[in-house]
Amino acid sequence: MEWTDDGIVLGVRRHGESSAIVELLTRGHGRHLGLVRGGAGSRMRPLLQPGNSVSALWRARLDEHLGAYALEGTRMRAANLLGASHATYGVTHLASLARLLPERDPHDGIFERLERTLDDFDTAGEAAIHLIRFELAMLTELGFGLDLSTCVATGTTTELIYVSPKSGGAVSRQAGEPWRDRLLRLPPFLREADEEQSGWSDQDLLDGFELTGRFLLRHVLEPRGQGHSDARAGFINAVVKHQARASAAAISG
Protein backbone atom coordinates (compact mmCIF):
# COMPACT_ATOMS: atom_id res chain seq x y z
CA MET A 1 0.00 0.00 0.00
CA GLU A 2 1.25 3.49 -0.76
CA TRP A 3 -0.03 6.98 -1.43
CA THR A 4 1.26 10.54 -1.74
CA ASP A 5 -0.52 13.57 -0.33
CA ASP A 6 -0.09 17.09 1.00
CA GLY A 7 0.06 17.29 4.78
CA ILE A 8 0.39 19.65 7.73
CA VAL A 9 2.39 18.53 10.76
CA LEU A 10 0.18 18.35 13.87
CA GLY A 11 2.56 16.62 16.25
CA VAL A 12 5.50 14.28 16.68
CA ARG A 13 6.67 11.88 19.37
CA ARG A 14 9.87 9.91 19.71
CA HIS A 15 9.76 6.21 18.87
CA GLY A 16 12.72 4.09 19.87
CA GLU A 17 16.24 5.48 19.70
CA SER A 18 16.13 7.35 16.42
CA SER A 19 12.65 7.27 14.87
CA ALA A 20 9.53 9.35 15.44
CA ILE A 21 5.81 8.89 14.94
CA VAL A 22 4.50 11.91 13.05
CA GLU A 23 0.86 13.00 12.96
CA LEU A 24 -0.28 14.84 9.84
CA LEU A 25 -3.53 16.34 8.70
CA THR A 26 -3.52 15.38 5.03
CA ARG A 27 -5.68 16.72 2.24
CA GLY A 28 -7.03 13.41 0.96
CA HIS A 29 -6.38 10.91 3.76
CA GLY A 30 -7.40 12.89 6.83
CA ARG A 31 -5.57 12.83 10.13
CA HIS A 32 -2.95 10.15 9.65
CA LEU A 33 0.05 8.87 11.61
CA GLY A 34 3.21 7.29 10.28
CA LEU A 35 6.74 6.35 11.30
CA VAL A 36 9.61 8.57 10.18
CA ARG A 37 12.92 6.76 10.41
CA GLY A 38 15.58 9.10 11.76
CA GLY A 39 12.83 11.49 12.83
CA ALA A 40 14.29 11.91 16.32
CA GLY A 41 17.57 13.24 14.95
CA SER A 42 18.65 16.87 14.71
CA ARG A 43 18.62 16.81 10.89
CA MET A 44 14.90 16.09 10.74
CA ARG A 45 13.86 18.23 13.70
CA PRO A 46 13.29 21.50 11.75
CA LEU A 47 11.01 19.70 9.29
CA LEU A 48 8.90 17.90 11.88
CA GLN A 49 7.64 21.00 13.68
CA PRO A 50 3.88 21.56 14.06
CA GLY A 51 2.58 24.02 11.50
CA ASN A 52 4.92 23.02 8.68
CA SER A 53 3.45 21.80 5.39
CA VAL A 54 4.96 18.72 3.78
CA SER A 55 4.67 16.45 0.80
CA ALA A 56 4.12 12.97 2.23
CA LEU A 57 4.74 9.53 0.78
CA TRP A 58 3.19 6.82 2.99
CA ARG A 59 3.94 3.12 2.61
CA ALA A 60 2.70 0.08 4.51
CA ARG A 61 2.22 -3.61 3.84
CA LEU A 62 -1.44 -3.38 4.84
CA ASP A 63 -3.73 -0.37 4.98
CA GLU A 64 -4.44 -0.82 8.71
CA HIS A 65 -0.73 -0.74 9.61
CA LEU A 66 0.97 2.36 11.01
CA GLY A 67 3.18 2.56 7.95
CA ALA A 68 6.19 4.76 7.26
CA TYR A 69 6.41 8.30 5.97
CA ALA A 70 8.93 9.89 3.65
CA LEU A 71 8.46 13.65 4.02
CA GLU A 72 9.65 16.74 2.16
CA GLY A 73 8.98 20.26 3.38
CA THR A 74 6.86 22.53 1.19
CA ARG A 75 6.16 25.44 3.59
CA MET A 76 8.47 25.76 6.58
CA ARG A 77 6.38 28.05 8.80
CA ALA A 78 7.43 26.81 12.22
CA ALA A 79 10.44 29.07 12.71
CA ASN A 80 8.31 32.18 12.23
CA LEU A 81 5.41 30.80 14.24
CA LEU A 82 7.61 29.97 17.22
CA GLY A 83 8.78 33.57 17.35
CA ALA A 84 5.49 34.88 18.77
CA SER A 85 3.68 33.62 21.86
CA HIS A 86 0.23 33.89 20.30
CA ALA A 87 1.36 31.76 17.36
CA THR A 88 2.98 29.12 19.56
CA TYR A 89 -0.21 28.71 21.58
CA GLY A 90 -2.35 28.97 18.46
CA VAL A 91 -0.61 26.17 16.57
CA THR A 92 -0.92 23.89 19.59
CA HIS A 93 -4.63 24.68 19.88
CA LEU A 94 -5.24 24.20 16.16
CA ALA A 95 -3.62 20.76 16.38
CA SER A 96 -5.88 19.85 19.32
CA LEU A 97 -8.91 20.88 17.26
CA ALA A 98 -7.78 18.82 14.28
CA ARG A 99 -7.50 15.80 16.60
CA LEU A 100 -11.25 15.99 17.12
CA LEU A 101 -11.60 14.61 13.58
CA PRO A 102 -11.74 10.83 13.19
CA GLU A 103 -8.42 9.31 12.17
CA ARG A 104 -7.98 8.59 8.45
CA ASP A 105 -11.25 10.35 7.56
CA PRO A 106 -10.74 12.98 4.81
CA HIS A 107 -11.82 16.55 5.54
CA ASP A 108 -10.33 18.53 2.67
CA GLY A 109 -12.24 21.70 3.59
CA ILE A 110 -10.70 21.72 7.06
CA PHE A 111 -7.28 21.04 5.54
CA GLU A 112 -7.63 24.04 3.23
CA ARG A 113 -8.81 26.28 6.07
CA LEU A 114 -5.95 25.17 8.31
CA GLU A 115 -3.45 26.06 5.59
CA ARG A 116 -5.01 29.51 5.14
CA THR A 117 -5.04 30.04 8.89
CA LEU A 118 -1.36 29.16 9.32
CA ASP A 119 -0.37 31.29 6.31
CA ASP A 120 -1.90 34.41 7.93
CA PHE A 121 -0.93 33.88 11.56
CA ASP A 122 1.77 36.52 12.02
CA THR A 123 -0.37 39.33 13.43
CA ALA A 124 -2.16 38.55 16.69
CA GLY A 125 -5.50 40.14 15.80
CA GLU A 126 -5.74 38.53 12.36
CA ALA A 127 -4.60 35.21 13.84
CA ALA A 128 -7.44 35.44 16.37
CA ILE A 129 -10.03 36.00 13.64
CA HIS A 130 -8.70 33.06 11.64
CA LEU A 131 -8.74 30.82 14.70
CA ILE A 132 -12.31 31.77 15.59
CA ARG A 133 -13.38 31.00 12.02
CA PHE A 134 -11.52 27.71 12.21
CA GLU A 135 -13.42 26.78 15.38
CA LEU A 136 -16.67 27.70 13.63
CA ALA A 137 -15.70 25.51 10.66
CA MET A 138 -14.89 22.63 13.01
CA LEU A 139 -18.37 22.88 14.53
CA THR A 140 -19.87 22.62 11.06
CA GLU A 141 -17.60 19.75 10.06
CA LEU A 142 -18.55 17.79 13.18
CA GLY A 143 -22.27 18.28 12.57
CA PHE A 144 -22.99 21.20 14.91
CA GLY A 145 -22.87 24.17 12.56
CA LEU A 146 -24.35 27.50 13.60
CA ASP A 147 -26.84 29.28 11.33
CA LEU A 148 -25.54 32.84 11.28
CA SER A 149 -27.21 33.90 8.03
CA THR A 150 -30.85 34.31 9.11
CA CYS A 151 -32.61 35.50 12.24
CA VAL A 152 -33.95 32.43 14.00
CA ALA A 153 -36.93 34.42 15.32
CA THR A 154 -38.06 36.44 12.29
CA GLY A 155 -36.29 35.05 9.23
CA THR A 156 -34.70 38.41 8.39
CA THR A 157 -31.12 38.60 7.15
CA THR A 158 -30.18 42.12 8.26
CA GLU A 159 -28.84 43.56 11.52
CA LEU A 160 -27.88 40.15 12.85
CA ILE A 161 -25.96 41.04 16.01
CA TYR A 162 -26.84 38.26 18.46
CA VAL A 163 -26.77 34.46 18.64
CA SER A 164 -29.16 32.32 20.65
CA PRO A 165 -27.15 30.26 23.17
CA LYS A 166 -29.80 27.53 22.90
CA SER A 167 -30.32 27.09 19.16
CA GLY A 168 -27.07 28.50 17.79
CA GLY A 169 -29.07 30.65 15.37
CA ALA A 170 -28.52 34.33 14.66
CA VAL A 171 -30.91 36.89 16.13
CA SER A 172 -31.58 40.36 14.72
CA ARG A 173 -31.17 43.55 16.70
CA GLN A 174 -34.91 44.17 16.99
CA ALA A 175 -35.90 40.59 17.84
CA GLY A 176 -33.13 40.19 20.38
CA GLU A 177 -33.43 43.51 22.19
CA PRO A 178 -35.76 42.26 24.97
CA TRP A 179 -33.34 39.39 25.75
CA ARG A 180 -30.04 41.06 24.92
CA ASP A 181 -28.50 40.16 28.28
CA ARG A 182 -29.15 36.47 27.66
CA LEU A 183 -27.87 36.34 24.08
CA LEU A 184 -24.35 35.92 22.74
CA ARG A 185 -22.90 38.69 20.60
CA LEU A 186 -22.24 37.98 16.93
CA PRO A 187 -19.07 39.87 15.95
CA PRO A 188 -19.10 41.70 12.60
CA PHE A 189 -16.34 39.59 11.05
CA LEU A 190 -18.56 36.51 11.32
CA ARG A 191 -21.44 38.30 9.59
CA GLU A 192 -19.54 39.39 6.51
CA ALA A 193 -19.97 37.08 3.54
CA ASP A 194 -16.58 37.95 2.06
CA GLU A 195 -14.83 37.36 5.42
CA GLU A 196 -13.07 40.71 5.36
CA GLN A 197 -11.08 41.29 8.53
CA SER A 198 -11.45 45.06 8.72
CA GLY A 199 -13.59 46.89 11.21
CA TRP A 200 -13.20 44.67 14.28
CA SER A 201 -12.51 45.64 17.88
CA ASP A 202 -10.77 43.85 20.74
CA GLN A 203 -14.20 43.15 22.22
CA ASP A 204 -15.28 41.56 18.94
CA LEU A 205 -12.45 39.05 19.31
CA LEU A 206 -13.50 38.16 22.85
CA ASP A 207 -17.12 37.85 21.72
CA GLY A 208 -16.05 35.52 18.92
CA PHE A 209 -14.15 33.25 21.30
CA GLU A 210 -17.08 33.23 23.72
CA LEU A 211 -19.41 32.23 20.88
CA THR A 212 -17.40 29.38 19.39
CA GLY A 213 -16.12 28.27 22.79
CA ARG A 214 -19.62 27.88 24.19
CA PHE A 215 -20.79 25.55 21.43
CA LEU A 216 -17.54 23.60 21.14
CA LEU A 217 -17.71 22.87 24.84
CA ARG A 218 -21.37 21.86 24.81
CA HIS A 219 -21.55 19.81 21.64
CA VAL A 220 -18.03 18.46 21.11
CA LEU A 221 -15.77 18.58 24.15
CA GLU A 222 -17.97 17.85 27.15
CA PRO A 223 -19.56 14.74 25.55
CA ARG A 224 -15.99 13.40 25.18
CA GLY A 225 -15.14 14.25 28.77
CA GLN A 226 -12.85 17.09 27.66
CA GLY A 227 -12.56 20.81 28.22
CA HIS A 228 -10.91 23.61 26.30
CA SER A 229 -7.17 23.17 25.87
CA ASP A 230 -4.75 25.19 27.98
CA ALA A 231 -3.32 26.39 24.67
CA ARG A 232 -6.62 28.07 23.80
CA ALA A 233 -6.56 30.08 27.02
CA GLY A 234 -2.89 30.88 26.42
CA PHE A 235 -3.65 32.08 22.90
CA ILE A 236 -6.48 34.35 24.02
CA ASN A 237 -4.34 35.78 26.82
CA ALA A 238 -1.44 36.41 24.43
CA VAL A 239 -3.75 38.17 21.95
CA VAL A 240 -5.27 40.35 24.69
CA LYS A 241 -1.80 41.38 25.89
CA HIS A 242 -0.63 42.10 22.35
CA GLN A 243 -3.68 44.23 21.60
CA ALA A 244 -3.23 46.13 24.88
CA ARG A 245 0.40 46.89 24.02
CA ALA A 246 -0.60 47.99 20.53
CA SER A 247 -3.29 50.32 21.92
CA ALA A 248 -0.87 51.81 24.46
CA ALA A 249 1.72 52.38 21.76
CA ALA A 250 -0.85 54.09 19.52
CA ILE A 251 -1.87 56.43 22.34
CA SER A 252 1.67 57.31 23.39
CA GLY A 253 2.84 57.64 19.80
From Swiss-Prot:
UniProt cross-references to HAMAP family, sorted A to Z: RecO (MF_00201)
NCBIfam families: reco
Record-level GO BP terms: DNA recombination; double-strand break repair
Gene designation per UniProt: recO
Function text: Involved in DNA repair and RecF pathway recombination.
Organismal lineage: Bacteria, Pseudomonadati, Pseudomonadota, Alphaproteobacteria, Hyphomicrobiales
Chain segments annotated as coiled-coil in the UniProt record: none
Family, similarity comment: Belongs to the RecO family.
Organism of derivation: Nitrobacter hamburgensis (strain DSM 10229 / NCIMB 13809 / X14)
Keywords of this entry: DNA damage, DNA recombination, DNA repair
Name of the protein: DNA repair protein RecO
One term under GO cellular component: bacterial nucleoid
Gene3D superfamilies according to UniProt: Nucleic acid-binding proteins, Recombination protein O, C-terminal domain
